[in-house]
From Swiss-Prot:
Residues 256-261 are extracellular. It is found in: Golgi apparatus, trans-Golgi network membrane; Cytoplasm, Perinuclear region; Cell membrane. The chain crosses the membrane at residues 235-255. Residues 1-234 are cytoplasmic. This is Calcium-binding protein 8. It comes from Rattus norvegicus. Residues 1-41 are annotated as: Disordered. Interacts with PI4KB. This binding competes with FREQ/NCS1 binding in a calcium-dependent manner. It is a single-pass type IV membrane protein. Ca(2+) 2 binds at residues 127, 129, 131, 133, 138. It holds the Pfam family EF-hand_7. Calcium binding induces conformational changes in CALN1/CABP8. The calcium binding affinity is not regulated by magnesium. It comes from the Eukaryota.
Amino acid sequence: MRLPEQPGDGKPENETKGDQETPERGEEPRRSPAPDFPTWEKMPFHHVTAGLLYKGNYLNRSLSAGSDSEQLANISVEELDEIREAFRVLDRDGNGFISKQELGMAMRSLGYMPSEVELAIIMQRLDMDGDGQVDFDEFMTILGPKLVSSEGRDGFLGNTIDSIFWQFDMQRVTLEELKHILYHAFRDHLTMKDIENIIINEEESLNETSGNCQTEFEGVHSQKQNRQTCVRKSLICAFAMAFIISVMLIAANQILRSGME
């Protein structure tokens, strides 16, 4: 995921050495190769039905009266539902709130090694009522305007990803070709390494939960179709979550830079 580039070659001069150190001015959150976390630290595999993703079949889908509804007026039902599903993925314990610990685990699963300072800044940005956790209205109020103003907003709609997987299914492209198709569609927000990490993580999650993904296919080719459907559903959530994290990282980086000036 790309953060705003600094003057010069765009590379940070120093890396964050520990969780308690404050990043230098203009420094990006520390990246690492795909980490080998224990199973319990991997992103949970959520089985999402197409109805939930594309038809808006959520209870209490409307934003609360306290949210800035005027800024979010241009958010489509599909975008709102995908943001809500990404929120559910981040909310590991399902209590309706995102904690700093849950946010940290989500970022680490995508290869980011945020310091405690960076996590605190992101949480402060999201936690509008100061209760130490983030509910969906707070999450949406911060993310919504960013999504509306994003040039790549259409790329994160589920039907775009479905179109990509239609090419994968019908043209029988290789996994390497699929990576390049995904990179071309999402390169404004994701690097090739991001895409590879997401695919690896989701494939591992699928293997660990094989047999639990409920799909509608039956017959001779059902196993292959079920597997592709489960991977696609999981990737939709993963890409939406990756976009959300990239937005939060940009906001955190801007706050860090402004605080140093």
